């Protein structure tokens, strides 16, 4: 199974079934090492040392993405609300983009929805949908190849 992603005006909605329980999915979205492992999807890499996470409303997380040509881009987000292990909302201050990550228990894992609102015009393109889909597919691969360990547990 692969991710599905759909553009609707200034919104992008991507969905993916994941082979892990909601707590592991949550930790993947909030752990610097896991974020580095999947965030670049098929189109970029994320140097692990570039990822910072301050998991609280008003806290930031940031990371660098490195394209195949070596171009690096710093991404910065601010957490709006945190409801572990089911919902994470964060904004990208530069573009005004708001992302809501929802994790629901499902048979054999969890169902993940990533809903981005207020997409700027330059991101309302098929390439953005494909990119988000590839990130969710990379997350699924990461979860399949990494066993649950104590650090997967939320506090």
Where are the regions that the model predicts?
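Hydrophobic ligand-binding cavity/cleft-lining segments
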Residues: 1-45
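Glycine-centered tight beta-turn/hairpin loop motif at sheet-sheet or coil-to-beta transitions
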Residues: 9, 70, 94-96
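Short beta-edge strand/loop motif at the mouth of beta-sheet-based domains
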Residues: 13-14, 33-72, 151-155
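A short, structured loop/turn motif at beta-sheet edges
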Residues: 22-23, 56, 80-85, 102-111
């Amino acid at each position: 199974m692969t991710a599905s992603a759909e553009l609707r005006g200034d919104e992008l909605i991507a969905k993916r079934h994941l082979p892990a329980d909601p707590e592991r999915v949550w930790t993947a979205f909030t752990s610097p090492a896991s974020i580095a492992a999947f965030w670049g999807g098929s189109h970029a890499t994320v140097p692990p040392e570039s990822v910072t996470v301050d998991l609280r409303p008003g806290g930031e997380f940031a990371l660098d993405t490195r394209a195949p040509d070596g171009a690096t881009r710093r991404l910065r987000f601010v957490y709006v609300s945190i409801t572990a292990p089911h919902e994470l909302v964060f904004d990208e201050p530069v573009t005004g983009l708001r992302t809501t990550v929802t994790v629901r228990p499902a048979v054999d894992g969890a169902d993940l929805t990533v809903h981005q609102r207020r997409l700027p015009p330059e991101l309302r393109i098929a390439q953005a949908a494909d990119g988000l889909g590839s990130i969710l597919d990379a997350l699924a691969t990461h979860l399949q190849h990494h066993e649950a360990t104590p650090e997967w547990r939320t506090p």
